[in-house]
Amino acid sequence: MSQFKRNASSKKLDSETKYKLETLSELFPDWTNDDLIDLVREYDDLETIVDKITTGAVTKWDEVKKPSKKEKPASHIEHQSHSSHQQLQQQAASHLDPEDSPSLINQHHSHQRQSRSTSKFSNNSANGKSVQQRQQHQSNNKDNKKQPSKDSLKPAPLPSKSNAGNNAGSWAAVLAEKKKAHEKKIDHTKSSNTIAHESTNEQSESNEHTEPTEVEVAPAQPVDSAPESVSHQHAPESESIATTNGDSKPKSWADIASAKSRQRQLQQQNKKQQQQQKSKPLDNFDALKEEVDQLSSEQTENGNHAISQEPEQQQQPYAQQSTFEEPAQQEEEVVAETTEQQQSQQPQQEEPAQPEVSQVQETAPVSLPEETNAANGVSNIQFGSEDKAAQQTLASQNYYQQQPNQQYAPQQVPQSAAAAAAAQAQAQQYYMYQNQFGYSYPGMFDNQSYLGYGQQFGAPQVPQGQVQPGQQAQPGQQPAAGSPNAQQGQTASAYGAPSGTGYQSQEVPQQSPAQQHVQPQQYSGYGMPYMYYQQSFPYGQPQYGMAGQYPYQMPKAGYNYYPPQPQSQQQGGQAQGSTQSQVEEEQANGQQGGANANAANASQQYQQYYQYQQAQTQPQQQAQQGMPYGYSSYDYSSQTSRGFY
């Protein structure tokens, strides 16, 4: 075999491999070329190799203690059997290597010898190299002697082997080992005692190197999971080693995980069959499927039980709702169950024990919506038919207010609370909507001098949620047009739908942005709406003292909101064209507008500057006159309103 490997290696050194080898030998000068060739064959990716060498997951071939004669063939064959697993996996990829075929023949012997080679590993474990490293390394090299082709070294996506490798901590991996061990145990009880003792030592040692895996699994798995977590390639074979150790003496298993014994027995049988039928990996799929179904259905039953109990207790108050909710709930559980089964069958053989976990996880999120629905009485998270249920529940709760459209109105809160909430919401919206087009903003009419004020808001306003003294209507009800209170109905629907339309007034959200607020001067008494403050942004921040933030913002005639600031730096761009003398000329020319007069108390420089600007902008102002274009401000000379809309 090894000779074969050498030839192959000399034949097959293509440029890529050479490049990798050079890089690696630069990085790790103490590694020999042969070892590196093995690694390059094993792992395609350069990064992976470097990673493995630095973490010590792979060690140099020559460091492993030379196996004695008896063990040498054993380890060869062990790796052959490994390759046979891989070969089976390869059927998926259909890249079969002719060299591998002997492994099928040798497969029967593999287990026998494996147990011996394992004892060798555990004896060696005293020399300070971790068992895993040695074992990993041996496996690397043996594999490569055996299997030069890159393809055959990649784990293929076939049943239990490769997947067990990928979930380093999965029960499936442990069970797979269990199964193999079981066979070996039957074959050779003779070697079992010595190995059992060694295996316990070895386990304790390799525990130090394991990545954290599931708690119950840990003792059996260590040997297997560390190499796996470092390399998926070796999963199967390291598994088999772990197996021999952990398993040749069943008692230790029983001690470690007696709780799972029933499952494990089932598992053993299945896996044993699977082992025998290796060449036809999917034969015993049905048996497995049954088992999975059984597990998952047990689980769903429990899950459903838990789910359906709680809503039922809480749902008694809402009879209707519960009847509607039940179908949805069952539907969901069915979905959960089926998806669960599909999931557990996909990784076909691997995960027979996984259903427990995944099932719990799956039912949990399903149950949440139900519980919240039941608790709130109104479903926040609605599936399919449940919103019907919610609507009807509302209808039944509001049965005492038999208005035709009542069913659509949001649930009524006690009136005082509703009024407060509405007031708050509208206060918020008042500020929100100030600067949006297409509304008439109540802020505009706050100072009663505004012409349209009396017409728009002449009618006394009653906050939405409250009822006028004479009116015995439910909060959501529109008074009939003829009634003495019709006036309120009409003003209320000034922004909402007109009262004839069969909409509940409440369905139009807070109709006017701030209907309740229109009592004069309610807002901390600025007599002027934001609309007339100058805006430097198109969005709706109220512009109080923003001059500092926006370089081109200038005070206008009659506004002292902005402290005068020396504008020369801010306005640098426009100033560049003019010299000081020009500015003074202009001043002498008597061009002081009203704006200048107002700015007179500011510094001399400021005045000159401002005036220069006026001179710049006059032509533009004339062009703009009469265009409703700097919408947010009536002062068309303002720098800021130009160009935004």
Curated annotation (Swiss-Prot):
Keywords: Chromosome, Cytoplasm, DNA damage, DNA repair, DNA-binding, Nucleus, Telomere, Ubl conjugation, Ubl conjugation pathway
Record GO biological process: DNA repair
Bias-annotated ranges (Polar residues): 118-139, 191-204, 294-307, 373-383, 634-645
Gene Ontology molecular function: any one: DNA binding
Localisation: Cytoplasm; Nucleus; Chromosome, Telomere
Domain of life: Eukaryota
Domain CUE: 16-58
Region annotation (Disordered) ranges: 57-421, 452-521, 555-645
GO cellular component: chromosome, telomeric region; cytoplasm; nucleus
Bias (Low complexity) ranges: 83-95, 162-173, 264-279, 309-327, 336-362, 395-421, 454-490, 509-521, 567-626
Post-translational modification: Ubiquitinated. Proteolytically cleaved by the proteasome in response to transcription stress; the resulting N-terminal form constitutes the activated nuclear form and the C-terminal portion is degraded.
InterPro entries, sorted: CUE, DEF1_CUE
Entry keyword DNA-binding: yes
Family recorded in the similarity comment: Belongs to the DEF1 family.
Role noted for this protein: Recruits the ubiquitination machinery to RNA polymerase II for polyubiquitination, removal and degradation, when the transcription-coupled repair (TCR) factor RAD26 fails to efficiently displace stalled RNA polymerase II. Also involved in telomere length regulation. Binds DNA.
Subunit-structure text: Homodimer; may form higher order oligomers. Interacts with the large RNA polymerase II subunit RPO21; the interaction is direct and serves to bridge RPO21 to the Elongin complex in a manner dependent on transcription stress. Interacts with RAD26.
Name this polypeptide is given: RNA polymerase II degradation factor 1
Native source species: Kluyveromyces lactis (strain ATCC 8585 / CBS 2359 / DSM 70799 / NBRC 1267 / NRRL Y-1140 / WM37) (Yeast)
High-level lineage: Eukaryota, Fungi, Dikarya, Ascomycota, Saccharomycotina
